[in-house]
Amino acid sequence: MANKLRSKDFIKIGVTSNQTISLAMGILKKYYKHDSNEMNLELIKQIKESPEEYYDDPILGIIAEEFYEYDETEEDETIELHKEEIELKVFGRPLIKENAFQQMKTAMTLPIVEHGALMPDSHLGYGLPIGAGLATKNTVIPFAIGMDIGCRMSLTLYDVTERFFKMHEHKFKQSIKDNTAFGLAKIISHKQEHEFLDRDIFSNTPLLKRLKSKAAKQLGSSGSGNHFVEWGIVELEDDEELGVPAGKYIGLLAHSGSRGFGASIAKFYSYLATNGSNLPYKLRHLAWLDLCTEAGQEYWMSMNVAGDYAIACHDQIHKNVAKAMGLKPICRIENHHNFAWKEMIDGHEYVVHRKGSTPAGKNILGIIPGSMTDPGFIVKGKGNEASLSSASHGAGRKHSRKETINRNTKSEMSKELKRLDVSLIGGALDESPYAYKSLERVMAYQDELVDVVGKFSPRIVRMDRDK
């Protein structure tokens, strides 16, 4: 979009609720950013006039719900929700805004939900808050995993000194500038090869078959928004799970997911789940698939394929950058944080959905990043079942993208980067450090969930939007 849409543009077409405007702006920016303002406003106008035509759309259905006028006569046609409140475990409630808390409380009324947990980094999301865990039995909710299936962290350590890093800082900077690609239409300039593309899984469903060319094209690239690849200083404590001695290392940290490949899978199966669902409209986007059905089994298989694709993308990122630097890795730590797993809780098997939350099973290693300037942490899980063996996946947003842009300036962000000796390649104002909660405070609320075994301090950060 050439010029940003403003609140007054929505008011002109009869959309006056600040909540609806904010929601619509966020979705349009994320999923329809290449359409014109006129096209986007016309789309919102159509949704407002005929919301029922968009309820089953996994993305636009969220906006359609804002225009829905509830009719009590329809109540008999809907699935009965939980009458008794299912316990929701909340960690770091003072850090969680009321809208995210209420969004999770609404999700907890789903009749298939058995357990739920909110992490201290939680904030409002689409369908389910970011920083949430949800446990069901033999059912999976595509939208509770999200559009970016397998979004993940991966950290590779190199046994080189900080002095070496400073001496060759320009080369380190060039290595991630030349060997990464961010955003919707961006791909790595040279052909990528990975064994993932040779697997016979692509013949399993017509959708996977259609998506193979997209997977090959986008392999090794990253998304936009808060996705990044960055060099930094790693300080490790002495811990046997790490497998390397305590001390300082140079690390390459990546955050991204399954790109358009995973998004296509998420959209397709979210539509299957919502189509014909008898859930109340406010919950329809959290419709589920039974794992005993063909659709449920297909989604579970496809979700795992998308997760493997995300791993393959990270493999290529680390391989390409390391090759450019002539470095050999000594350790890799990684984890998904948008995914579902079959796990045992209190002796029973559940499907644990993690949307923006880090797996924190007993002695499981994970990565919780800060912002583009604030250090992140390498953690070891304690297996706390109250949190569904989960922890935060970052600091979590304190301010929305719009609020961050309105309250901060590029000059202020540049000064903060300079003060903390961080070089930024690309990046946007809405990802300013100002946007995020204090990770130190977030970590203080989850000492029952994880132990800190290392720290990552960013030095060169690569994100979308080159400058």
Language-model features: locations:
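Charged substrate- and nucleic-acid-binding regions of tRNA-handling and nucleotidyl-transfer enzymes
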Residues: 1-67
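Charge-biased, low-complexity intrinsically disordered regions
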Residues: 7-9, 13, 96, 100-101, ...
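Polybasic, low-complexity association/targeting segments
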Residues: 52-93, 319-333
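N- or domain-start disorder-to-order transition segments that initiate the globular core
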Residues: 67-113, 189-192, 197-204, 218-221
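Domain-length cofactor-binding catalytic modules of enzymes
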Residues: 86-87, 96-99, 111-114, 126-130, ...
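Signature of the chorismate-utilizing enzyme
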Residues: 106, 130-142, 157
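Catalytic-core region of right-hand nucleic acid polymerases
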Residues: 141, 146-164
